[in-house]
């Protein structure tokens, strides 16, 4: 079957923004103008198409990134809507990995908020080309030029406005297109009636100045244009667009547009800009991977004739069709009903049906081609970050890294019947979300769930009740402490039982040493000459792992250590995997105790926005919470305080801040890193855990 849309006319884009910058409304308008939605949904009616989980409609925030296809001027645009709340950074990270370009939405009043910085850095990490859209130009306090300045200074980007607003706040009536050098006025409420007009006389100088900047940015990307520009010749709109496209795809400039999505102004030019400036799958470099059979680096170009390779980036439980696996095809073609290899797990899987998603309804399709985003039904073992590919040409694409959860709560089902339902439901939610973890506490037998923040866990508990009908009691949030070692130590583990019949014999010597933060756990086998047979080595590793998982000081997992197995002995008859696992576990506990173990706690990056008069009190309060103030700046009549504070001190902060600032202060925080707990506090925590 021939392609409906050639690759060059495909755009895979994400929409990224701070909470409340108007992301879902903008997406909704895009779907309206591209003809996919016949009546626009408003977020504050709880009817927006992209927000299709009940929790999202109630809270007016977007949690899951729904992937939607729409069409504009003979191009297919796949939009991935990403959440803006810090607790959901995993969703953003996950979608940026499979996008080719992004639209960053900023609020004309709030400008670059802390969350925008986080998301922007994530996009930098993946080298995603972006265009910026300054929304809410009709709001009190809207200031387009201030937002452009902040994009340059706070995000370190190179913003190039390709539009200027006509009017401001309630007089905002349209935009000036700097490329075509004309004014566009919106004449009706739906924003479908556009009238071209003369540029207002009082804006001519400003327009000339900014048009010059646009031409310069376009010329810098292309030598021919540069020569023409330096000769003082006027560049044509087509030439300017071609130059800007090159510069945007090379992540050298960020074209900036403006509008008011809620008032339906500025959305069609934004769609044009997506088509003009953001890359198609052909414009980005071939995707890198590893051939699992040879271990060599391999590449896949965006082409239907290459072998099939795709990355699963989201799993969702759908009430009607079961488990949906969203994936991005990097190369080749996949037909419904065919077999693929999950090269990450080395398992063969069958694709049942293929679906193209529109925010809340789905269309069944026969095949997907390179560059497309679709959902598959029938994949049993494929999780987020797995590669699926043609089994004759295996490749493992670079996966994604997800942060470890920082906050735990105990959860108990209200009735016996709920017990089984709860564990199935939690299992399913953990499949969907790699930053959500669950386990059973060995000492208390309680089920513990862990996530990236209080809101994250609230929504998980909410989904348990609604989707899986599980009633549960939830404990108080606890901090996810960790342990590590500061020194190096050797220890012996000997497990010998030889009393009649088959005995047990496992004997190991290990050395433990600290790794730099964030490196996790590393196991090195330095056994030579077969003092421990090869088949027992994995058992030693498993035993060490188990001991480190359950902690030594206070029962918290030990992280960032390297364990080296360097000696030991075995018995021809009595040795077994079990014996070596126990010996490994015994040695690990001893080694940690000898190597100066310490307790670590999660440190959060906190940003508090308060009116000037509450500044002193807020800083004093953060200091009393063991906070380190990093810096302060003024922003729109408010003061912004930035710092790092231990998570343990931040519980209930929202309420305290409200009462200290009479409801006018706001804050955001997200996980930054782990740090050693001060000795006096560590001793208290350890004693409490040991029940002294």
From Swiss-Prot:
Gene Ontology cellular component annotations, sorted alphabetically: cytoplasm
Main location as per UniProt: cytoplasm
Keywords, in A-Z order: Cytoplasm, Elongation factor, GTP-binding, Nucleotide-binding, Protein biosynthesis
GO biological process: ribosome disassembly
Keyword Nucleotide-binding: yes
Disulfide bonds: none
Binding site residues for GTP: 17-24, 81-85, 135-138
Membership in a protein family: Belongs to the TRAFAC class translation factor GTPase superfamily. Classic translation factor GTPase family. EF-G/EF-2 subfamily.
Protein name: Elongation factor G
Lineage, highest ranks first: Bacteria, Bacillati, Bacillota, Clostridia, Thermoanaerobacterales
